[in-house]
Curated annotation (Swiss-Prot):
Cited CDD domains: NAT_SF
Binding site for acetyl-CoA: 94-96, 102-107, 133-135, 140
GO annotation terms (biological process): nor-spermidine metabolic process; putrescine acetylation; spermidine metabolic process; spermine acetylation; spermine metabolic process
Family, similarity comment: Belongs to the acetyltransferase family.
Encoding gene (name): Sat2
Record's protein name: Thialysine N-epsilon-acetyltransferase
Localization: Cytoplasm
A GO CC annotation given for this chain: cytoplasm
Active site: 140
Amino acid sequence: MASTRIREARESDCGDIMRMIRELAEFEKLSHQVKISEEALRADGFGENPFFHCLVAEIIPAPGESQGSLVVGYGLYYFIYSTWTGRNVYLEDIYVMPQYRGQGIGTKIIKKVAEVALNKGCSQFRLAVLDWNKKAVNLYKFLGAQDLTESEGWLSFRFEGEAMRELAGR
């Protein structure tokens, strides 16, 4: 029987990760917002000073099966800093291919990110989810995450493109 393992991504995984980034964006109805390329992903995550870290979920075939291993999910994260609580980790993306959902793979990725965070001395593990993605919302709550919009009233903002250039005076 095939098994699943969660491991650190390698540079050679960038094609699979980029494919899944596009699949996630399509699922979120935001595919028009994906601007990065596989080359940018490779440079930003696997250079001397990576901007992010990534885990992949890999299906390992049972002994005697002819197919090779298959990357079916990923979790892309980075470290941030809170002036209130110190070191934190932020899970930017978590994705499992639809045909592999419901097998606990997403939970394994989340647990591995939590393990990494604790090993790095982080006090919090943060992530965001679209409000209509009820399966993900329910999973995060089941795993013990707190909805900060509900409990503390936090809203999330971003500056991008022209607004960011204008703000910087460029």
